[in-house]
Curated annotation (Swiss-Prot):
It comes from Neisseria meningitidis serogroup A / serotype 4A (strain DSM 15465 / Z2491). It holds the Pfam family TGT. Residues 246-252, 270-274 are annotated as: RNA binding. The keyword Mitochondrion does not apply. This is Queuine tRNA-ribosyltransferase. The lineage of its organism: Bacteria, Pseudomonadati, Pseudomonadota, Betaproteobacteria, Neisseriales. It catalyses: 7-aminomethyl-7-carbaguanine + guanosine(34) in tRNA = 7-aminomethyl-7-carbaguanosine(34) in tRNA + guanine. The keyword Zinc applies.
Length: 371
């Protein structure tokens, strides 16, 4: 089940509601990443507290461990991990194709060795759909070939054509399995605008209920990523949700929304938090730096998260230096809360027709830097 309602547009920025089997999502939305079925350093109550509306699970990793036979006993991923709101799962393709020296790609699918025990495994569109059906995620993704950013035009064309054939197979398998959830297609084409348009045209013929932009933030220069966003975002079908995969910084989210993106995921806020890199309204803060040793202020005096309301920079500095788990937890709560606040503010700005003003103020504040 998927119903997308577009409430308001301000330029290309959009404000909508996405209705899924496990609840409604207000867009634009950021999805914290729970690779192994948990968002690192967060429990489900923490996620509720920061107002996370949907999280992402990783098909590849959950397939390998704990395995489908375990998740199936709980009726799907929601029951297994104790999360009652929507979940999106990726197809597993990105992780498999990252194993470049351990995998073999054919039209049928991809053969690879398990990095856990060396077992020979095979992932195809049909198997990916089977896995995601067992996981019972609210949004599943087609299996696609993740084209590297530096691909030649001919490589990119062959890759996107394979992805389109796999999209058709994914959709058929999804329907044959009578999966009651939603399946998104993925626009590929590397850094070639005309190939992106070719990919989009093929996906539109398959009539997926939502579309994602894949193959960005895979090593290409930032200006190239933004060029592709400018080219693809505004031409995605207006009546369907638009998902930018694996992106990114706070500035990337704002740029994406400005060019028609509704959904984002990225490990950056959680990974950076564990490394002591904190995002604030006035730039980024490295809590491990010695200057915070005696600082009684919170991370961000305007922030309402649990970490900022209760603890000083000095304490967080100490926790990070000591390698305490609590430090990673508090840092992660803050970073994910900050991302959720950005999204909420963008939703409100679009509703009020003031997105451009909000965007300008956001960049001005971020450029100021922290003290």
């Amino acid at each position: 089940m998927l119903k997308f309602t577009l409430h308001k547009k301000d330029g290309y920025a959009r404000r909508g509601t996405l209705e899924l089997n496990h609840g409604k999502i207000e867009t634009p939305v950021f999805m914290p990443v729970g690779t192994y079925g948990s968002v690192k350093a967060m429990n489900p109550q923490n996620l509720h507290d920061i107002k996370a509306q949907i999280i992402l699970g990783n098909t590849y990793h959950l397939w390998l461990r704990p395995g489908l036979e375990v998740v199936e006993q709980f009726g799907g991923l929601h029951g297994f991990i104790g999360w009652d709101k929507p979940i999106l799962t990726d197809s597993g393709g990105f992780q498999v194709f990252s194993l470049s020296d351990m995998r073999k790609l054919t039209e049928e699918g991809c053969t690879f060795k398990s990095p856990i025990n060396g077992d020979k495994l095979f992932l195809s569109p049909e198997i990916s759909m089977k896995i995601q059906t067992v996981l019972n995620s609210d949004i599943a993704m087609q299996l696609d070939e993740c084209t590297p950013g530096e691909a030649t035009r001919e490589q990119a064309r062959k890759s996107l054509q394979m992805s389109l054939r796999w999209a058709e197979r994914s959709k058929k398998a999804f329907e044959d399995l009578k999966n009651p959830n939603a399946l998104f297609g993925i626009v590929q084409g590397a850094m070639y605008e005309d190939l992106r348009e070719e990919s989009l045209k093929g996906l539109e013929e398959l009539d997926f209920p939502g579309l994602a932009i894949g193959g960005l933030s895979v090593g290409e220069p930032k200006p190239e990523m933004y060029r592709m966003l400018r080219a693809v975002g505004p031409i995605l079908p207006e009546h369907k949700p638009h998902y930018l995969m694996g992106v990114g910084t706070p500035e990337d989210l704002v740029y994406g929304v400005a060019h028609g993106v509704d959904m984002f995921d990225c490990v950056m806020p959680t990974r950076n938090a564990r490394n002591g890199w904190l995002f604030t309204r006035f730039g980024d803060l490295k809590i491990k730096n010695a200057k915070h040793k005696l600082d009684k202020r919170p991370i961000d005096e305007s922030c309402t998260c649990y970490a900022c309301q209760n603890f000083s920079r000095a304490y967080l500095h100490h926790l990070h230096r000591a390698g305490e788990i609590l430090g990673a937890q508090l840092n992660t709560i803050h970073n994910l809360h900050f991302y959720q606040v950005i999204m909420a503010e963008m939703r409100e700005a679009v509703e009020q027709g003031k997105f451009a003003d909000w965007q300008a103020q956001f960049h001005e504040n971020r450029a100021r830097g922290t003290d």
